[in-house]
Regions:
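Acidic catalytic cores of enzymes that act on phosphate-bearing nucleotides/polynucleotides
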Residues: 35, 164-166
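Glycine-rich phosphate-binding loops that contact phosphosugars or nucleotide phosphates
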Residues: 3-139
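Internal, active-site/partner-interface "lid" segment
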Residues: 124-162
Length: 166
């Protein structure tokens, strides 16, 4: 829907580990040739420094496992003050962040992959990543396949995986 309605640019906003995850997909997108107006910013910098490219037509993408990250909550408020739309991920529903974002995704243990699906979906919709559907299909198998990868990696990992992952 956001892509259909149009947008000026995309801001990946986070703090701590969330910013780290956002940064990984930001750089991956660039390596894939992404020409979308994509910005990566620390939530505190977003709040206090601002960005001349940020407008009511921007899309802000945030995540917070707890749903209570204060800087991210404040970034959502700032986005809404100018009329920008916010896409968010949390693992705990009925939290401030879950209640504030315009589009919410919630699950457990999927934040890293979620960042990839969001940014790559924007790229797909812009005609810049035609392998999106294949990637998402492959990612659905990761939880079960990763255990076998651990087992195949070395004997110590196999012992651990046999004991705790099956």
């Amino acid at each position: 829907k956001i892509c259909e309605d149009g947008y000026k640019n995309i801001f990946l906003v986070g703090i701590g580990g969330t910013l780290l995850y956002a940064g990984q997909i930001f750089h991956t997108a660039r390596q894939l040739g992404c020409s979308l107006p994509l910005y990566l910013t620390n939530a505190t910098d977003f709040l206090y420094e601002g960005d001349a490219n940020f407008t009511k037509d921007s899309v802000v993408v945030v995540a917070s496992l707890s749903g209570h990250t204060v800087e991210v909550e404040q970034a959502i408020d700032k986005a809404h003050e100018v009329g920008a739309r916010v896409i968010g991920y949390v693992e705990v529903v009925d939290t401030p962040i879950a209640n504030k974002v315009d589009e919410l995704v919630t699950t457990v243990g999927g934040e890293y992959y979620w960042w990839y699906t969001v940014v790559l979906r924007f790229m797909k919709n812009a005609g810049q990543f035609d392998k999106y559907d294949e990637l998402v299909s492959d990612m659905q198998n990761l939880p079960k396949d990763i255990v076998q990868v651990y087992k195949d990696a070395d004997a110590q990992m196999k012992e651990y995986a046999d004991k705790y992952c099956d």
